[in-house]
């Protein structure tokens, strides 16, 4: 929706105002920003944003789904992009969906250990996908692991999100550290910032077209009898 140029200028503006981009376990104050990216659709879009952040000297926190129906994080291409994001200095971790499991704790451990083994990382914080019901029932750690909706990362921080394509640029424009009473927990989904469009549906339709082209190409590559 907003485009990579807009993402760049938004981050540059925050840096000019002396905000400091850091991780969730640093000594946080009102000038701190914990930049979080939940990857719901496109690993390639995540990589595009990660490159810009690297060039601007900041580090972000990227969370990838193992249970996604829209991308496979361990396909050869996606795994390569995720590893590149990590090598750029960003933190990579698990975007866990508690809504798909009856035994949340057991399957959380399975996903966490799988992610750690595949990508060679140690996970100390995860983000939650569709967290509402989980948070209604309890706001607790997952088998001793922190998550981004715990009170210390949510209620005790100013939370700002572009979920569903919400335009948060005006909110960020008027923020300055001296006016903040809490650190900023900033959730940005790369898909809203890598293409230009007038509304969320247009962005998603554009993504769907790319996915369709990709699936046609993969089908032809995997089955020689397929005719486009």
Predicted regions and their residues:
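Beta-strand-loop-alpha-helix segment that lines the small-molecule cofactor/substrate pocket
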Residues: 91, 95
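Terminal accessory/targeting
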Residues: 1-61, 65-80, 86-89, 99, ...
């Amino acid at each position: 929706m907003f485009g990579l140029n807009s993402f760049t200028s938004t981050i540059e503006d925050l840096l000019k105002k002396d905000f400091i981009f850091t991780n969730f376990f640093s000594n946080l104050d009102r000038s701190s920003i914990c930049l979080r990216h939940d990857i719901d659709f496109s690993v390639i879009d995540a990589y595009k944003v990660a490159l810009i952040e690297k060039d601007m000297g900041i580090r972000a926190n990227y969370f990838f789904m193992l249970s996604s129906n829209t991308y496979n994080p361990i396909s050869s291409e996606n795994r390569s992009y995720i590893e590149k994001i990590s090598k750029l200095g960003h933190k990579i971790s698990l975007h866990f969906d508690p809504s798909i499991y009856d035994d949340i704790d057991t399957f959380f451990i399975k996903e966490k250990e799988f992610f750690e083994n595949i990508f060679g990382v140690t996970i100390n914080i995860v983000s939650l996908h569709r967290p509402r019901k989980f948070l209604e029932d309890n706001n607790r750690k997952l088998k001793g692991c922190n998550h981004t909706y715990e009170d210390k990362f949510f209620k005790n921080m100013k939370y700002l999100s572009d979920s569903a394509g919400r335009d948060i640029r005006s909110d960020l424009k008027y923020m300055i550290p001296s006016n903040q009473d809490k650190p900023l927990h900033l959730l940005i989904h790369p898909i809203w910032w890598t293409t230009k469009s007038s509304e969320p549906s247009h962005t998603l339709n554009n993504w769907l077209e790319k996915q369709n082209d990709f699936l046609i190409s993969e089908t032809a590559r995997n089955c020689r009898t397929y005719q486009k």
